[in-house]
Amino acid sequence: MKNESQLKSSKRGVLLRLAIFMALMISAFIIPSSALADFGYTEDSTNYTIDTGANLVFKVKRSNGDISSLIYNGTDYNGYTNKNSHVEIGLGQSDVTISQPSSSVIMVKVVYGTLEQYYVARKGENNIYMFTYIADDSVTVTRYIVRLKPSLFPVLNTSNSWYSSYSTLEAKDIFTDTSTGYTYSKHYSDTRVMDYNYTGISNGNVGAYIVRSNHEKASGGPFYRSLIRDNTNVAVNLYEILYYGMAQTDVKRYGLQGPYVLAFTDGGEPSSKLYAGNLKTDWIDSLGIHGWVGSSGRGRVAGVGIKNMKSDYEYVVGFSNDEAQYWTKASDSNGYFSCTNMLPGTYTMTIYKNELAVYTTDVTVTAGGTKILNSITITDDPSDNDVTWRIGDWDG
């Protein structure tokens, strides 16, 4: 027979095993199912299905490269009335392939003629990194549209949204809000591209956003205004528009644009780490994306300062050529500016007082180099001219 100490030891062993069993049972209920997901992909005859290993699972159609499903925390937010999320106006039959370049990256490549679209997932992130490569005019519109189910998001009547429930004035693109008397254009937002980092929508529990790219291959410069979001009870669309061909006076640029990021959140704003000026991109260098130029192949321009600046005006320094465009804000106090991650080449540098060009020169950027400019004096501001009288001021 067991003595008293042996019985006590046996009881303690049983209780310990019971406690461990109960803890495991409880954890099975409190750990979200998404946390048990494995990073990876599967495929069938219709779709590639990518599990990010976080809360996002998405599908890409093997026929044309559309995103056909965006499942976040178990709910599919993609599409409406048989429309998916897609590049350009949607592609025809395409060559769509999938690969896993590393243990933490999955990439889908879509080739349609001379257009290439890339979707990249990183392990443990609720983000899809996207890139678009165009080589010629066979691609008429350079844009990406994320289409979301309208029943899952509120209708937002804001100044940077196109709201198609207004009364139509002209060509199905110009609308009026009879309650306020305001007129809206589908293709003209009140928000300049330099003034926003992302566009999107939230229902309080889930947010879906496009974090814009640096727009180096876009058209229009820092003050470009275009369609950003439309939002009604029948459609929610988020846009990354690089070239739309709406009588634009700037050149159409070719090559690779990206990354721009489709980011899902638990209702809040996307992380500022995804912003074009903040995003770390060294992990992209080894993916073999057509046209990609890493940070080592780029350069910088810095200006010591700007003289003859007028108070109460913002000064922006823009750079452009036929291959790329960039911009940066000058310091309000002394006009210091720095523009980083520029592709090599010779650029027209323009200083803007608000949106008025007041100084222009050429600068050359080299890979890995920094071009330092001595203090610049603005000489082309018409506000400096003597006049008899003037209403307002020149500001573009």
For the regions a protein language model found, what residue spans apply to each?
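Beta-strand-rich N-terminal accessory domains
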Residues: L36-T81
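Extended, loop-rich substrate-binding clefts of extracytoplasmic carbohydrate-active enzymes
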Residues: Y80-Y133, R143-I145
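A contiguous, surface-exposed recognition patch within enzymatic or periplasmic domains that forms
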Residues: K149-L256
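Beta-strand-rich domain onsets/edges
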Residues: L274-R300
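A short, amphipathic beta-strand motif
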Residues: G297-N308, G335
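Short, acidic Ser/Thr/Gly-rich low-complexity loop/linker segments typical of extracellular
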Residues: N321-S338
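A short, solvent-exposed beta-strand micro-motif common in secreted/extracellular proteins
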Residues: G335, P344-E355
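Structured interaction patches on ligand/partner-binding surfaces of diverse proteins
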Residues: E355-N374, I378-D381
